[in-house]
Amino acid sequence: MKEELIERFTRYVKIDTQSNEDSHTVPTTPGQIEFGKLLVEELKEVGLTEVTMDDNGYVMATLPANTDKDVPVIGFLAHLDTATDFTGKNVKPQIHENFDGNAITLNEELNIVLTPEQFPELPSYKGHTIITTDGTTLLGADDKAGLTEIMVAMNYLIHNPQIKHGKIRVAFTPDEEIGRGPAHFDVEAFGASFAYMMDGGPLGGLEYESFNAAGAKLTFNGTNTHPGTAKNKMRNATKLAMEFNGHLPVEEAPEYTEGYEGFYHLLSLNGDVEQSKAYYIIRDFDRKNFEARKNTIENIVKQMQEKYGQDAVVLEMNDQYYNMLEKIEPVREIVDIAYEAMKSLNIEPNIHPIRGGTDGSQLSYMGLPTPNIFTGGENYHGKFEYVSVDVMEKAVQVIIEIARRFEEQA
């Protein structure tokens, strides 16, 4: 199993599938189409049926039941795309067998080193086989680790028919990293009662609470004149943006929050005297606090409009997804089975809220309750990203055990 995990994963990450927020196509990048087509062929080779890829790049497949019991149809999902935060082109995965727990020089020429001082969890992987980058790209374990694990688990179940299971549906979705993953997902065609998203992090991760999320685009309009004669004439749009940001609580930013704490995050700011644009994301687990944060944004805008004029600040704000807990609670047994599956494999479940987005959040509100399970990756979205193959193997075992338990309990 370990060899198959390494072979598939290292091959998959070399395909550039970064999504593109500025694109209006679906998927947003051709690499995702290329990858999807490859997976269609490999799913068929493994032995799955009803393998499809629609015009929007969504890949679906079926592992038929091998039991006569009336078992609910369950799904396993992962996403095709990788993050846009750092380059994902020309990924060169580096395999470190029997890792000694010490610092790893990723790139000697550029002096890029993965150190326990910077990443304290690193020594806990001593003895594992880990896969890192070469320091010049992200790795893409988010979410090609999860995708690989699903492929390997399906292959294992097909070759081990003594493990009884109901019908299993598999789906690989595009554009998750830019929040568009479920936009064209056909829940009815997928046909599962519920699903598990293989898109988590370290060993034991089991997540069924997510942020409530919104995005806010602010355009600040200034008046540019010659600075030598600017008195009482110039209005500096960049300073308006700075003023707006100054009204937000400093301590309620990502770098100062954890656990169940929400935040405002200035994702980008660019412009000049004439016009500046800022993009914020707003996050909170509590729906009332979430609405209060959006009201704070709106109130600051109103205050600045009263001070500088209606055209000085233009706000576009939209909700992105909601806390999936509300949709998971009525079918809590899907969490319980995943929890029990981990315990039976001597994995200690680590239940914590997702401080980020996952397709599962939106899918849960579309009628497909979808908690999130660990995949074995660390330090996603950057050059220090790595994955433990040993933990990936555990994730495969969890998928298999979940399928087995649903059949056993039917």
UniProtKB/Swiss-Prot annotation:
Cellular compartments annotated:
Cytoplasm
Sorted alphabetically, which keywords does the UniProt record give? Answer: Aminopeptidase, Cytoplasm, Hydrolase, Metal-binding, Metalloprotease, Protease, Zinc
Q: Write out the catalysed reaction.
A: Release of the N-terminal residue from a tripeptide
InterPro entries found in the cross-reference section: ArgE/DapE_CS, Bact_exopeptidase_dim_dom, Peptidase_M20, Peptidase_M20_dimer, Peptidase_M20B
Any one cellular-component term (Gene Ontology):
cytosol
* Binding sites annotated in the UniProt record for Zn(2+) 2: 142, 177, 381
Q: What class of enzyme is it?
A: hydrolase
Which residue positions are annotated as catalytic?
Answer: 81, 176 (proton acceptor)
The Gene Ontology biological process annotation of the record reads:
peptide catabolic process; proteolysis
Q: What is its EC number?
A: 3.4.11.4
Which residues of this UniProt protein bind Zn(2+) 1? 79, 142, 199
A Pfam family of the record is: Peptidase_M20
- Name the needed cofactors: Zn(2+)
Q: Name one GO molecular function term.
A: metallopeptidase activity
Give the record's cofactor note, including how many are bound.
Answer: Binds 2 Zn(2+) ions per subunit.
What the record says about family reads: Belongs to the peptidase M20B family.
Q: What does this protein do?
A: Cleaves the N-terminal amino acid of tripeptides.
Known PANTHER family for this protein? PEPTIDASE T (PTHR42994:SF1)
Spell out the protein name for this chain: Peptidase T
Highest lineage ranks of the organism? Bacteria, Bacillati, Bacillota, Bacilli, Bacillales
